[in-house]
């Protein structure tokens, strides 16, 4: 995952600030927008966890501060629910102009309600997910119900929410009064996922039921059992992100990852403008390789030498476990820690003139289990019998030839 700071203008020309999270290969299949809760901001830990889950599934996620909150310009006292909706529309327009039109809209609490209103105004949105969303915007006034009389009398009041003071004006409440979510949801006709915790004491579970009843199919409900309203537990927000990612893949278009084809076991592909960030297909698995930032890379994946060390580590643990199981020895866990010492930067500078350097792998093995010293010594010997270990020690030939671009019709898949 990589993070970009972005800025765009809202309807009033004020600057809104956000973060765009990209998947590790920098090639998202879809873009999503996340709307944070009332008086929250883009940096809520739960939002980051949900974003991380989505980027791990190939989505790019834009999370930003609504007008008057966080890093964004504007005075919160002059904002309202309609303004939040317009901010989401502005965010979608920014993505469409600079990246790609968003297809997934996610909102938490009042941000979820705003997402439902905004989805009706953003043609590119193909799916909407809400988390702990109220079934009507006016629900939020319960947070300052003791101040309603003061608002009616003087036109505004100061309320303390989450340890911070916020000025709420009468125009904010008037705007809420004019919003009806059930009618918007009924007319939305876009796939909807509703996530809500039964124990939510800020926005009761009844709200989820009312949204669900108002919506047309396809609609889904997922219970976030045991979670609080802000999804403070990491496992709750991560779960929500994984569910949203899996569910939305049914409704947004995801191109098949068939770019990399080969008749061999592994293929690596690197475009001219991608630096060292390399797309790879290893058997049936896709991954990204890169170089560290101090070598001029972006560190979006393991380096070539790290992959080589990984091969030795993986082969060693597999060989040890296979041997100990055959011997019926009690080994609960094997870990192999491997480092390669020769600097890749030095290799590259001297690769055509200096082949005398010794490649050294430092390998440390930890064993958890009921083993005596004789067994441990034998396992240490077995580690050297790992096939990759033998390959690294043996005389190896690499046969290289230039061929025409690979014809995908010849691929094994």
Predicted regions and their residues:
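N-terminal cap/lid segment of alpha/beta-hydrolase-fold proteins
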Residues: 1-26
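Short beta-strand/loop motif that positions the catalytic acidic residue
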Residues: 188, 194-196, 200
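Hydrolase active-site cap/lid region
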Residues: 123-171
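Alpha/beta-hydrolase active-site loop
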Residues: 46, 78-98
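Conserved alpha/beta-hydrolase
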Residues: 51-73
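The serine-hydrolase catalytic nucleophile loop
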Residues: 39-51, 206
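Extended beta-strand/beta-hairpin segments
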Residues: 236-242, 246-310, 321-413
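Conserved alpha/beta-hydrolase "acid-adjacent" motif
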Residues: 201-207
